[in-house]
Curated annotation (Swiss-Prot):
Highest taxon of source: Bacteria
Family of this protein: Belongs to the cytochrome b family. PetD subfamily.
UniProt function note: Component of the cytochrome b6-f complex, which mediates electron transfer between photosystem II (PSII) and photosystem I (PSI), cyclic electron flow around PSI, and state transitions.
A single GO cellular-component term on record: plasma membrane-derived thylakoid membrane
Family matches, as PANTHER family: CYTOCHROME B
Protein known as: Cytochrome b6-f complex subunit 4
Membrane-spanning segments: 36-56, 95-115, 131-151
Subunit record text: The 4 large subunits of the cytochrome b6-f complex are cytochrome b6, subunit IV (17 kDa polypeptide, PetD), cytochrome f and the Rieske protein, while the 4 small subunits are PetG, PetL, PetM and PetN. The complex functions as a dimer.
Keyword Electron transport attached: yes
SUPFAM superfamilies: a domain/subunit of cytochrome bc1 complex (Ubiquinol-cytochrome c reductase) (SSF81648)
Amino acid sequence: MSIMKKPDLSDPKLRAKLAQNMGHNYYGEPAWPNDILFTFPICIAGTIGLITGLAILDPAMIGEPGNPFATPLEILPEWYLYPVFQILRVLPNKLLGIACQGAIPLGLMMVPFIESVNKFQNPFRRPVAMAVFLFGTAVTLWLGAGACFPIDESLTLGLF
């Protein structure tokens, strides 16, 4: 018994659908059991084998090895905390820095209420939400890049 389902080309309904470029789902190789039982496990095993082989043959170091007896000149957090670190570093009062970080989620929660008149889902037709998103992205990138510079050059990114 063949797994392939042969189309009946003498059927007028099928001929009409084929004339309209339809009917490709009526014949061909089925996904079950051919793809799911044979092709997918081979792809998954190959991917796992490739990643494991690369990890064993060429172990890449993540940064330089740590030395517990030497303190670095400047301690930086992980890259995703650079903007928060920069806010705390630049603002003179630490309470003001914490208040600014608390104001960010509060401001984001206010955006739907500010733009509640606009019923469009398309982001290009929602100017307030798009402006808040673009401004927040630009400020986050600016703060993140500034965290890598010394404190006196961090706000200007060393350009001025």
